[in-house]
Amino acid sequence: MAQSSNMKKYILLLVVSFCFLGFQQKQTTWVAIGDSITYLNEHTNETGNRVSKGYMTRVTEQLPNIQYTNQGHNGWTAIRIATEIENLGIAKADVYSIFLGTNDWWGGKPLGSFNDYEKNTGNQTVYGSFRTIINKLRSLNDQAKIILITPMQRVDFVYINSYKNNAFGSYKDKNGQWLAQFAEAINTIGKFEKLTVVDLYNKSGMNHDNLVKFKRLKNPHTGVYQNYPYPDFIGIPFNPDTDEYPYPVEAIDMTYDGLHPSDKGYAVIADMLVKVLGK
């Protein structure tokens, strides 16, 4: 009798175990391709410890069944990623995200036209480079979900570890091109390929007026430091050799340096990604 009872308990335990395994979510692999905004997820010390965690860490906290690989390359353009695509060791994955374009804009790289994408004309343009990247990802896994992420808006950037590394924001054009055009190109590619687009430029709520609370600069007339909100700081000189860092901790809003997301900004990006990755 006791032996029969033990057997029933054993069978019940097996059934419960199989049910539990059945309800466990399948592990999903995700390769995140990008520039410094992606790279910093594993290098938060390079933010002057102003960021605690990037968007991939935040996504996997909400979706623990996802395992990510960081293919963020600091300072790289879409054109460089495309040119080096065979040397990056990109693995086969269930999901790929491509978050590029802001460095192409600042570097004056030609956006090109949709024809460059459609006709696969090569890596001389951003449009053509996206075709190269997407083709590579499809060769690795033609069933993978590919997510395109547009560049986010930016204001005046000053690198916290080297003030001479600075750039104006997307409130004006660079070499006759607007960052908004690069975002629109990515939307166009997404629509053509029927890919999911996370449109940070237009739909994240991260706009020129909330990327930083102010920029601290010397008043040109008095020489006294003053906190200038956007757009009042546009055109006021910044001397990287003599001026203090223009974005003290109190200036942090959606970014901590005018370009790279703060914890608040990374949370916005992660939440937008969770909505599409969680489907």
PLM segments and residue spans:
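Acidic/histidine-rich helix-loop elements
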Residues: 40-51, 70-76, 110-122, 225
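Serine-esterase "nucleophile elbow" of acetyl-processing enzymes
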Residues: 22-72, 84-93
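Bacterial Sec-dependent N-terminal signal peptides
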Residues: 1-28
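Alpha-helical transmembrane segments and their juxtamembrane interfaces
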Residues: 18-19, 45, 155, 209
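Alpha-helical cap/lid subdomain in secreted, periplasmic
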Residues: 25, 57-62, 82-279
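Gly/Ser/Thr-rich helix-start
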Residues: 35, 41, 73-76, 102, ...
